[in-house]
């Protein structure tokens, strides 16, 4: 499929934004209709989940190749139990309707909770969920330029 038609197809399937999944029917529909789905499990009061949603909103707009959704784990006990979600936030990476990776908490990004959109993007790129990681590449380049300025 040509890139333009593929982007239109992705957009019609909800790609390009972070959507809330409210029930298991929606969850399984999203998983079935998109090749790559990145699911954030959190709850409304979780501050780290809120930060993650902000980063994922940015990434969803930049990466049409994956569908980004979030689930309130407290309101979706069936899905949460089925996927063995035991820590919030948790990111579940689904490819071809199968769980490929699961990241419990923030330790794989940055245990302090202070991470950039680029760091999350890089993790998802390494997982094979995103085709490239331009935000991460830009952040690394900016750091290298800052270090070069300090050394001069």
Question: What is the predicted role of each segment?
Answer:
Residues 29-30, 55-62, 79-82, 90, ...:
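Alpha-helical recognition domains of nuclear gene-regulatory proteins
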Residues 32-33, 42-43, 51-54, 81-85, ...:
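Short coil/turn segments at secondary-structure boundaries
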Residues 38-39, 91:
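Hydrophobic beta-strand anchors of alpha/beta hydrolase catalytic cores
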Residues 35, 60-67, 87, 107, ...:
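Eukaryotic basic, amphipathic alpha-helical target segments in cytosolic regions
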Residues 18-23, 41-45, 53, 57-78:
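Thiol-based oxidoreductase modules, predominantly thioredoxin-like and allied folds used
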Residues 68, 78, 88-108:
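A short, hydrophobic beta-strand/beta-hairpin element that forms part of a small beta-sheet core
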Residues 24, 49, 53, 73-76, ...:
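Generic preference for well-ordered alpha-helical elements
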Residues 1-34, 114-152:
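N-terminal leader/targeting and pre-domain segments
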């Amino acid at each position: 499929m040509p890139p333009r038609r593929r982007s239109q197809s992705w957009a019609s399937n909800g790609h390009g934004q972070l959507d809330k999944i409210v029930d298991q029917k929606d969850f399984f529909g999203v998983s079935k209709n998109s090749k790559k789905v990145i699911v954030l499990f959190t709850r409304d009061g979780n501050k780290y989940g809120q930060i993650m949603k902000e980063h994922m909103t940015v990434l969803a707009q930049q990466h049409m190749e994956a569908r980004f959704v979030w689930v309130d784990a407290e309101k979706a006990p069936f899905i949460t139990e089925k996927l063995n979600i035991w820590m919030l936030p948790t990111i579940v990476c689904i490819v071809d309707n199968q769980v490929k990776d699961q990241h419990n908490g923030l330790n794989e990004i940055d245990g302090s909770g202070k991470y950039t959109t680029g760091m999350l993007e890089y993790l998802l790129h390494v997982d094979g969920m995103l085709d490239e990681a331009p935000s991460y590449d830009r952040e690394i380049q900016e750091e290298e330029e800052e270090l070069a300025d300090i050394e001069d």
